[in-house]
Amino acid sequence: NQSAGGKGGGGEEGGGDGVFTVVEQPPTFPGGENALIAYIAKHLKYPQVALEQEIQGVVKLRFVVMPDGTVGDVVIQQGLESHCDKEAVRVVKSLPRFIPGKQQGKPVAVWYSLPIRFVIM
């Protein structure tokens, strides 16, 4: 798992749910990883409670990029604080469509890991 952005994976199903963790062609965000980071930076709203308590850190999320490129299930792998966790999930659910991952030339559902940083500037 990377610190700056996300990672799809290469040809194994994770957990028997029909969602791949590793595929031949991982899902990609339109415009690439820098565009994904910029989207999150623009749309992430620092929770007031977290600001007041000077809470900073990373929420590690995992979500499914569906065969149509939309975001499916979102799972918090490592939380920070409840308000920050909810905001990270909200932003991920608002992401525009990805270019879906492919296995044997067909679009498939793929898990995608993404750390979201909360830093007070």
Please report, for each region that a protein language model flagged, where it lies by residue.
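A short acidic/small-residue loop/turn micro-motif
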Residues: 77-84
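Intrinsic-disorder/low-complexity signature in envelope-associated proteins
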Residues: 1-30
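Short proline/glycine- and basic residue-enriched helix-capping loop/turn segments at helix->loop/beta transitions
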Residues: 26-64, 87-121
